[in-house]
């Protein structure tokens, strides 16, 4: 049986963690980005399909390529973030299933149903984005996930000629707590859950 993590760890990962809009100076190293992926990749996906593909934008040139896709409310926080991750999904993720899930012909489950392939890729890449957020928090970083952007523009600017499609953006860095909004409420257990 696994041991529960400490209350302090739960606070870091969930109860005290915030979505950040402002950032402090320290950069995020490429080694740290590699460590984020090294942790998040172990999160479960259906049939181990692992459809997420991530572009970590950490240069001014990369941010300028992204700028036209951003909504006005997300512009400044993204341009000043040390890193912005484009979390995309690979529409042909199933081509890696002989390696990732070598139990029967899992590839055929998706080649025979494009709708199932798309639903699976989008759903599981969304889960992987959540794992990325938790990995960042576990490594002492803050995040700011966003869906307010022009996905078609991002796909054309970053993924033209590929099988990748953007899902969401996540700003990554060391947050400036002085720029946080007041903490918003969450639904109670009774409002969000049922017991049968």
Swiss-Prot record:
CDD domains, sorted: RutE-like
Induction (free text): Up-regulated by the nitrogen regulatory protein C (NtrC also called GlnG) and repressed by RutR.
Required co-factors: FMN
Domain of life: Bacteria
GO molecular function: 3-hydroxypropionate dehydrogenase (NADP+) activity
UniProt catalytic activity: 3-hydroxypropanoate + NADP(+) = 3-oxopropanoate + NADPH + H(+)
EC number: 1.1.1.298
GO biological process, one term: nitrogen utilization
Keywords assigned: Flavoprotein, FMN, NAD, NADP, Oxidoreductase
Top EC category: oxidoreductase
Keyword RNA-binding: no
InterPro entries: Nitroreductase, Nitroreductase-like, Nitroreductase_HadB/RutE, RutE-like
Matches recorded under HAMAP family: Oxidoreductase_RutE_HadB
Family to which the UniProt record says this protein belongs: Belongs to the nitroreductase family. HadB/RutE subfamily.
Protein function: May reduce toxic product malonic semialdehyde to 3-hydroxypropionic acid, which is excreted.
Protein's name in the database: Probable malonic semialdehyde reductase RutE
Source organism per UniProt: Escherichia coli O81 (strain ED1a)
Gene: rutE
